[in-house]
Amino acid sequence: MKVGFISLGCPKNLVDSEVMMGQLVAKGHELTSHPDQADVLVVNTCSFIDPAKKESVDTILEMAEYKKIGRAKKLIVAGCLVERYRGDIRTEMPEVDALIGTNELDSIVDICEGMPPSTNPLEPYLYHDLTPRVLATPRHFAYMKIAEGCDHPCTFCVIPQYRGAFRSRRFESVVSEATRLFQQGIREINLIGQDTTCYGEDLGLKDGLAELLARLAQIETPQEKWIRFLYAYPNKVTQKLLDTLAEHAALAKYIDMPLQHASANVLKRMKRGASGDIFLKLIERIRRTIPGVAIRTSFIVGFPGETAADFDELCAFVEAAKFDNLGVFTYSDEDTSASYALDGKVDGRTIQNRKRRLMAIQRKIARARNRGLVGKEVPVLVSGVSGETDLLWEARMSTQAPEIDGVTLINDFEGSEPRAGEIRRLRITEAHDYDVVGTLLAPTEPAPVLPAGPGLINIESLVAV
């Protein structure tokens, strides 16, 4: 049976798709990148905010057309949209033949084969090191989920409603999977979860993430490796965690820490607490402990009750903090979120104007930071030929996370031609708003051994991501 997959949304959702694809391949089924050639089409959806819901619905309807013109006889919808709108999908989208919630990933084979699913949708699901996975990322890096669910009460967020309570993977399960990935030739592992800094709390571990990172850094590999974690909660960033990042060369000097806002008034309404002053002290401690660290954050503008003064406070905070990377989300008024009932809604035009203003501030900061890198030599992980032009190669510094940060472009090289998956030093020669450009220096390590075989596919072979 040929199955075509479309994975929408965040890396956590992508890992769920990889798990489902892995189970299908383990049972002898074939994956195809051509929806018109698939016997079964699967859309793994996102429903975090309104634009994500719209993209999910549009994609489902697009794939439904392939049931008419192609060979597909079954359309399966999976993921977060199913958890939020299972009943609506069943009644309003007759094109959909089956649904798979976030706790039902193990049912993918049964449903594709027309068998009754054996999975209990009410039992929390979390994959382990023996679960088959087909990697859908480029062959030199992978995402690895270390936890699922969330216990934080953020009023704007609906994730706990369909991902459930926080639960960690077993320590040795994570180590085992990471070891296998590195043995297969993966050069960079990105640890993910709704809140990675809570890792191990439910297992009785104190500073569980720090312990895990230290253990992963000690995995023996034939070549240099990078390990980073994403989605840190600010009040969970302990000194032990910072000391661990500073101690081990394999750990990327990078912290992704969504702060959401800097006004104490807005943060209180978000049920996150803290303030800009508290965050500035934390940022100073991070930079003091880890020289050269890159800090990424994200903010929500237009949250109910956000006044002009609150937004001005956020802008002043960003100018003071000087983040390396920053993302801005416009508030999405989700009908099942606690913030939906709050008063003081901000109009759409004001929200968009605030986003533009905040990004303009960050653009100047990022440009100045990048200019300070010109002339420096840094290690980069080569990604391959640039997607924008085949005249350039693309790479990333360890301070640039995949898919969300800027990139390092290679316009010249010394020695052998760049190869995807190799880590080489690069001399930065140009700086732009979010990207830098440089010359790749001659290699000092053997050519990378990239993973191959039926267990791994490249991201381009997915129908869409």
UniProtKB/Swiss-Prot annotation:
<dbReference type="GO" id="GO:0046872">
    <property type="term" value="F:metal ion binding"/>
</dbReference>
<dbReference type="Pfam" id="PF04055">
    <property type="entry name" value="Radical_SAM"/>
</dbReference>
<feature type="domain" description="TRAM">
    <location>
        <begin position="371"/>
        <end position="442"/>
    </location>
</feature>
<dbReference type="GO" id="GO:0006400">
    <property type="term" value="P:tRNA modification"/>
</dbReference>
<dbReference type="GO" id="GO:0005829">
    <property type="term" value="C:cytosol"/>
</dbReference>
<dbReference type="InterPro" id="IPR020612">
    <property type="entry name" value="Methylthiotransferase_CS"/>
</dbReference>
<feature type="binding site">
    <location>
        <position position="157"/>
    </location>
    <ligand>
        <name>[4Fe-4S] cluster 2</name>
    </ligand>
</feature>
<keyword id="KW-0408">Iron</keyword>
<feature type="domain" description="Radical SAM core">
    <location>
        <begin position="136"/>
        <end position="369"/>
    </location>
</feature>
<dbReference type="InterPro" id="IPR005840">
    <property type="entry name" value="Ribosomal_uS12_MeSTrfase_RimO"/>
</dbReference>
<keyword id="KW-0004">4Fe-4S</keyword>
<feature type="binding site">
    <location>
        <position position="80"/>
    </location>
    <ligand>
        <name>[4Fe-4S] cluster 1</name>
    </ligand>
</feature>
<dbReference type="InterPro" id="IPR005839">
    <property type="entry name" value="Methylthiotransferase"/>
</dbReference>
<keyword id="KW-0963">Cytoplasm</keyword>
<dbReference type="InterPro" id="IPR002792">
    <property type="entry name" value="TRAM_dom"/>
</dbReference>
<dbReference type="InterPro" id="IPR013848">
    <property type="entry name" value="Methylthiotransferase_N"/>
</dbReference>
<dbReference type="Pfam" id="PF00919">
    <property type="entry name" value="UPF0004"/>
</dbReference>
<dbReference type="InterPro" id="IPR006638">
    <property type="entry name" value="Elp3/MiaA/NifB-like_rSAM"/>
</dbReference>
<comment type="similarity">
    <text>Belongs to the methylthiotransferase family. RimO subfamily.</text>
</comment>
<comment type="function">
    <text>Catalyzes the methylthiolation of an aspartic acid residue of ribosomal protein uS12.</text>
</comment>
<dbReference type="GO" id="GO:0051539">
    <property type="term" value="F:4 iron, 4 sulfur cluster binding"/>
</dbReference>
<feature type="binding site">
    <location>
        <position position="154"/>
    </location>
    <ligand>
        <name>[4Fe-4S] cluster 2</name>
    </ligand>
</feature>
<dbReference type="InterPro" id="IPR012340">
    <property type="entry name" value="NA-bd_OB-fold"/>
</dbReference>
<protein>
    <recommendedName>
        <fullName>Ribosomal protein uS12 methylthiotransferase RimO</fullName>
        <ecNumber>2.8.4.4</ecNumber>
    </recommendedName>
</protein>
<feature type="binding site">
    <location>
        <position position="10"/>
    </location>
    <ligand>
        <name>[4Fe-4S] cluster 1</name>
    </ligand>
</feature>
<dbReference type="InterPro" id="IPR038135">
    <property type="entry name" value="Methylthiotransferase_N_sf"/>
</dbReference>
<keyword id="KW-0949">S-adenosyl-L-methionine</keyword>
<dbReference type="InterPro" id="IPR007197">
    <property type="entry name" value="rSAM"/>
</dbReference>
<dbReference type="InterPro" id="IPR023404">
    <property type="entry name" value="rSAM_horseshoe"/>
</dbReference>
<keyword id="KW-0479">Metal-binding</keyword>
<feature type="binding site">
    <location>
        <position position="46"/>
    </location>
    <ligand>
        <name>[4Fe-4S] cluster 1</name>
    </ligand>
</feature>
<feature type="binding site">
    <location>
        <position position="150"/>
    </location>
    <ligand>
        <name>[4Fe-4S] cluster 2</name>
    </ligand>
</feature>
<dbReference type="Pfam" id="PF18693">
    <property type="entry name" value="TRAM_2"/>
</dbReference>
<dbReference type="GO" id="GO:0035599">
    <property type="term" value="F:aspartic acid methylthiotransferase activity"/>
</dbReference>
<feature type="domain" description="MTTase N-terminal">
    <location>
        <begin position="1"/>
        <end position="117"/>
    </location>
</feature>
<dbReference type="GO" id="GO:0103039">
    <property type="term" value="F:protein methylthiotransferase activity"/>
</dbReference>
<keyword id="KW-0808">Transferase</keyword>
<keyword id="KW-0411">Iron-sulfur</keyword>
